[in-house]
């Protein structure tokens, strides 16, 4: 049962200060957002779409700062509440349906704590570092490239030499955002969390990306029967990065969810036609320069050399189609090719799937051709043979990856689907993604209606994510349930007591229809079903 509408509408207060959790003190970036041009939708009504999403998240319990009742809790850690957890689970189920099972992938679940040598082999101990600068007056530490990006509005490649980044800081007269003090020369900070394991104090690390689990587990998977290439391995789980200045809610975290796909393939063998024929006609929105966008089919992109590898074109098509299927407007998506100084240290070629938001273009998926970098590195450090055998020859598998940020994707879903219609706010998530699928409401709290509504709720709660909502006027309850995205409200009224029918209200249209209680499960199952895979 959800808290009352009154409780929801009051919002929540910071127990430490009595201030609203959405105050400027707690979230200094609020109110500093400029909407990019050329967009339609919710963000055109207000440049404060981020504020609206944060307000919704905190008031309704989608997500909120971890350990918020304690002073001094570290930034960059957020907890999902009941609605956020349900939305995350729905999103992951959609990923499993439209990416994992659609392509016949093999899903694993690896440990988040890994041996030091894993990251010696992967290069993370040496190269996984951000450029930082310190204020010489107050001592505050900042990501140097982010400060420059905020000042200039241009992307600053992380791999630029530290001296060049510092020269840009001086040229642009960038000072400390906190106190206006002068900034120090740029140095590097490794973002991995180091651990001491057991009484012996064995050095280990929290994984900075889930894919390393897939690489070190590949040999076991290969030897236990999954030996046909391409071999797409995938994993959903948590990764950890000791970010310098995490902020903006779910967009920059120290602990975060990833859904990663690592496709191991024979570089001398073409992609099978079964896969290719399914997606070669998918329209890709490619941006080679970060400005213009070319719309071209996956097949044309490969034949014209815009995307060098057929397997690369196929998986770019797969991931773009996934976001379109879950309701992201194609016109708000682009696949941006990264320049040489933007690519990760392990990548031969990189694309970012980005979605347009009130904060500008936001990266959701890193799509990298990693070559044999990873498996060759692990062979060298571990001493184990990770070669595969295919058509009479041995080879080191190459890798193409789709590294998805789940938390960021959830933020985008909220922003793109939060709509104001007059005085009504509606979270128009696709019904199959809604955290609460159906609400059961007695028209009034008397005359046997609550008892009958409870019977209906008990009938539905096992098969659907259902809630029972009573107390306020029916209009107030509808408004509250619209805001959290409930697609269907089942109202038990006086006619129900006469003929065993209920009113089903559609969230998006507000239209109502009578449905028999005996046929209600089948009606909801059809209305809430995941779209058919094509």
Where are these regions (language model features)?
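Short, positively charged and aromatic/hydrophobic N-terminal segments
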Residues: 3, 7, 14, 21-25, ...
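Residue-level detector of transmembrane insertion/anchoring sites
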Residues: 9, 15-16, 22, 397, ...
């Amino acid at each position: 049962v959800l808290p009352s509408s009154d409780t929801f509408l009051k919002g929540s207060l910071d127990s430490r200060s009595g201030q609203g959790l959405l105050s400027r003190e707690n979230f200094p970036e609020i109110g500093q957002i400029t909407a990019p041009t050329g967009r339609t939708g919710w963000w055109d009504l207000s440049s404060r779409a981020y504020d609206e999403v944060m307000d919704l998240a905190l008031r309704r319990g989608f997500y909120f700062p971890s350990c918020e009742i304690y002073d001094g809790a570290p930034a960059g850690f957020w907890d999902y509440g009941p609605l956020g957890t349900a939305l995350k689970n729905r999103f992951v189920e959609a990923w499993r349906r439209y990416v994992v099972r659609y392509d016949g992938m093999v899903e694993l679940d690896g440990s988040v704590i890994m041996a030091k040598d894993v990251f010696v082999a992967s290069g993370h101990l040496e190269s996984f570092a951000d450029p930082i600068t310190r204020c010489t007056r107050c001592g505050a530490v900042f990501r140097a490239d982010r400060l420059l990006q905020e000042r200039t509005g241009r992307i600053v490649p992380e791999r630029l030499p530290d001296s060049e980044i510092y020269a840009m800081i001086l040229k642009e007269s960038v000072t400390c955002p906190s106190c206006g003090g002068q900034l120090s020369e740029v140095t590097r900070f490794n973002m991995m969390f180091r651990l001491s394991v057991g009484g012996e104090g064995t050095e280990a690390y929290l994984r900075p990306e889930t894919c390393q689990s897939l690489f070190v587990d590949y040999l076991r998977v290969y030897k236990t029967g999954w030996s046909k290439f391409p071999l797409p391995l995938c994993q959903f789980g948590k990764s950890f990065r000791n970010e310098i200045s995490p902020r903006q809610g779910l967009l920059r975290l120290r602990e975060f969810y990833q859904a990663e796909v690592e496709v191991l393939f024979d570089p001398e063998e073409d992609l099978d036609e079964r896969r290719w024929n399914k997606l070669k006609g998918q329209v890709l929105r490619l941006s080679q320069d970060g400005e213009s966008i070319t719309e071209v089919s996956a097949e044309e992109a490969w034949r014209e050399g815009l995307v060098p590898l057929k397997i690369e074109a196929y998986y770019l098509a797969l991931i773009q189609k996934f976001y379109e299927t879950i309701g992201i407007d194609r016109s708000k998506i682009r696949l941006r090719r990264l320049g040489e100084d933007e690519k990760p240290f392990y990548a031969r070629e990189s694309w970012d799937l980005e979605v347009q938001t009130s904060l500008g273009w936001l990266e959701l998926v890193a799509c990298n051709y990693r070559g044999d970098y990873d498996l060759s590195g692990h062979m060298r450090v571990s001493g184990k043979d990770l070669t595969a055998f295919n058509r009479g020859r041995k080879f080191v598998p190459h890798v193409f990856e789709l590294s998805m940020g789940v938390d960021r994707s959830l933020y985008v879903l909220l922003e793109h689907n939060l709509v104001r219609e007059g005085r009504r706010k509606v979270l128009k998530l696709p019904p199959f993604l809604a955290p609460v699928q159906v609400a059961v409401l007695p028209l009034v709290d008397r005359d046997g209606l609550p008892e009958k509504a409870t019977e209906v709720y008990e009938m539905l709660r096992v098969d659907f994510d259902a809630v029972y909502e009573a107390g306020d006027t029916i209009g107030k309850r509808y408004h509250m349930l619209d805001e959290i995205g409930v697609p269907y409200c089942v109202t038990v009224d006086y006619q129900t007591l006469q003929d065993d029918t209920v009113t089903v209200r559609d969230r998006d249209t507000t239209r109502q229809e009578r449905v028999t209680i005996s046929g209600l499960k089948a009606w909801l199952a059809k209305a809430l079903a995941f779209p058919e895979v094509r």
